[in-house]
Design a protein with these regions (language model features):
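Expand to "…catalyze enediolate/carbanion chemistry for C-C bond making/breaking, isomerization
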Residues: 1-136
Length: 136
């Protein structure tokens, strides 16, 4: 934070702002072409778990409805020069979405990361004996 021309700072901030639109509903997929066409939108972010839920096919990532939705999203991003993004759980997942045209990834799914951290923490607590010292 330093002094300077406020108007110039706002201009620079606006140029550096990244706008990501989360696509996670059937309505989002229906409108993905219009969303991708909006000037200033940089990224289309896939909410894959929520999308399958809203499509009535929870966690069925090979279901024809989901596959068609992804194709529609990829086509819209390609047509309008937008970046595709999503969360990935592992290398296979990352490769699959890379091959589809996704280029921005959040590595690790929040619920899985939290589960891993909790499991590790509980393991430490379970290893303590009654005196509070760690068992060997």
């Amino acid at each position: 934070y330093i002094g300077g021309n406020v108007a110039e700072k706002i201009k620079i901030a606006n140029e550096r702002t990244l706008v990501m639109c989360l696509i996670e509903t059937a309505e989002g997929i229906e409108n993905v072409e219009k969303i991708a066409a909006v000037p200033g939108v940089d990224v289309l972010w896939l909410g894959h778990f929520d999308l399958t839920n809203f499509l009535g096919i929870p966690a069925q990532f090979d279901h024809p409805k989901y596959v068609a939705a992804i194709r529609k999203m990829v086509a819209a991003a390609s047509k309008h020069g937008k970046i595709l993004a999503c969360m990935t759980a592992d290398e296979k997942w990352s490769r699959d979405y890379w091959e589809k045209g996704f280029r921005l990834f959040s590595v690790g799914i929040d619920s899985m990361l939290l589960q891993g951290a909790l499991k590790q923490g509980i393991g430490v607590l379970q290893s303590l004996d009654e005196s509070g010292k760690k068992n060997k």
